[in-house]
């Protein structure tokens, strides 16, 4: 079961005719190609990588990347429409926010011309799948505590370390890896590298690089999440992304976009939850009357619908600011933490109205409940977001 709600419910300044066309195309893509494979993706712990190629053929990848690098030449508004439709369709298997938005914009912002020409067209086509590896077993929200090392060699660097909870980790061909190039410094000693693992021998990853098994998660089970291991993995000198030891500043800058991406999903998820619950409560009879006729049900849904509407106004403001180049780190942090909190709360309240059926994965609301919980954790835990906001007060 998927929602028929078009995204977004309220017309926004960023929802131009061409962006609306992207939303319609994305809705067709998820309905026809992705959702029918949801069960197989959940069993395998990863989606079929051919879906990335399919999205590329339909022009749905890297839409905010310039056309000269294989992208669509659009703005973040096009990406937001696409990601909204993904959430409304109920898909969490394709981590397209990472592959088609986050990683390409790191390369666009900090990459050399050679790096842009080598990687961006193949990411846009879906031929290569991308990931970004920041988190480590002992360094989650505190990225400055990472211990992965990139030691200089005669022709580049030798990379060693473990990265965990990496979205697209199993399917990735290209990984942006954060590692210490100055072990005596914290954030000032972090550099970013474009690590190319496309060269495989007999189906195996290159020497010095390996992947763990798909992580068993409580939600988003079809989404590819894995550990990555580097052991004296050779990285050429021209793989440095941006300035040496400038990686932490680059991460802080780009994380604002990532947090808005999570906000986009949070709002669409709330809208979907409300719609599914209204539909269910109007069909479900209790005490010889529709559940929707009960005052408690109506009040609960009225409050949830209001929260979803206010959240839509907030995320529309963030999307417009990002499109115009005016989004600030503090507002992005506010959006990430508050919208994630509201998403989890609204889905929980909606699930309650399903009664015991809400605890069954046969009903989408149960899967939404499990899928939503990570929103408070990744891209910076909500507690960290509050600290970032407090520093500006």
What are the functions of these language-model segments?
Residues 1-89, 93, 110-115, 122-127, ...:
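Alpha-helical interface subdomain recognition
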Residues 74-76, 142-144, 168-173, 186-189, ...:
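Short glycine/proline-enriched turns and hinge-like loops at secondary-structure junctions
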Residues 96-98, 123, 138-141, 165-168, ...:
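Short Gly/Pro-enriched turn/cap motifs at secondary-structure boundaries
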Residues 126-134:
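A short, Trp-centered hydrophobic/proline-enriched beta-strand micro-motif
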Residues 145, 201-232:
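Flexible, small-/acidic-enriched active-site or ligand-binding loops
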Residues 148-150:
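A structural signal for short hydrophobic beta-strand segments in well-ordered beta-sheet cores
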Residues 160-210:
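A short core secondary-structure module
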Residues 231-249:
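Long, acidic (Asp/Glu-rich), low-complexity accessory segments flanking structured domains
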